[in-house]
């Protein structure tokens, strides 16, 4: 009887410890996104410093005239829509609905790819107007900030492809559902960053 009580007493702290132990996937995701947040904060700071210098010498305003705001708004809507489809995919993963996960993540991949292609076309148009990364301070700030963001979008699209490939090759598991959720966190983060960039570059200018 004493032994049983003793074992119960030992088991309770172990259960409490297990419950209090942080989820390493969640911790890793938070750390990674925090690093990304600091990276983009640096890009925003660089943009505003460049803007202040450009406004001081009068070269900034004339460069912003090349921006096609309605076009940028259209591809922004596409990217934001991809965040919605991504979340629908996560909901499907939580239900164990593999077909739904594949469908919504595939749509997300398509929308993300359209955004990247749309941004590449914008670059092509701006270069045609003489605005390149080497043409001015504004050009450098514009291409560096939007270019790094585009690279993150491409990385997100690749991550979605990897998740879909893993689902195709093996039985759907909780680990795969977790992977889908982690990728969605990254994608939502990238979308929020773009909204900030869009407001800064195309409206504040």
Swiss-Prot record:
The keyword Cell membrane applies. It is found in: Cell membrane. The chain crosses the membrane at residues 29-49, 73-93, 104-124, 144-164, 184-204. It is a multi-pass membrane protein. Associates with subunits I, II and IV to form cytochrome c oxidase. Belongs to the cytochrome c oxidase subunit 3 family. PANTHER family: CYTOCHROME BO(3) UBIQUINOL OXIDASE SUBUNIT 3, CYTOCHROME C OXIDASE SUBUNIT III. This is Cytochrome c oxidase subunit 3. The gene is ctaE.
């Amino acid at each position: 009887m004493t032994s049983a009580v003793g074992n119960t007493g030992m088991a309770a702290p172990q259960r409490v410890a297990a419950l209090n132990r942080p989820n390493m996937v969640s911790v890793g995701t938070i750390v990674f996104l925090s690093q990304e947040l600091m990276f983009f904060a640096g890009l925003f700071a660089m943009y505003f410093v460049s803007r202040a210098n450009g406004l001081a010498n009068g070269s900034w305003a004339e460069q912003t005239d090349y921006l096609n705001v309605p076009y940028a708004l259209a591809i922004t809507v596409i990217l934001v829509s991809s965040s919605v489809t991504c979340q629908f995919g996560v909901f499907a993963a939580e239900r164990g609905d593999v077909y739904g996960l594949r469908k919504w993540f595939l749509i997300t991949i398509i929308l993300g790819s359209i955004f990247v292609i749309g941004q590449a076309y914008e670059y092509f148009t701006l270069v045609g107007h003489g605005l390149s990364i080497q043409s001015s301070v504004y050009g450098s700030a514009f291409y560096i900030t939007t270019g790094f963001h585009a690279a993150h979008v491409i990385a997100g699209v690749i991550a979605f492809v990897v998740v879909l490939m893993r689902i195709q090759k093996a039985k759907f598991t909780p680990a795969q559902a977790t992977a889908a959720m982690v990728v969605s966190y990254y994608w939502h983060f990238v979308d929020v960053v773009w909204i900030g960039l869009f407001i800064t570059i195309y409206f504040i200018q």
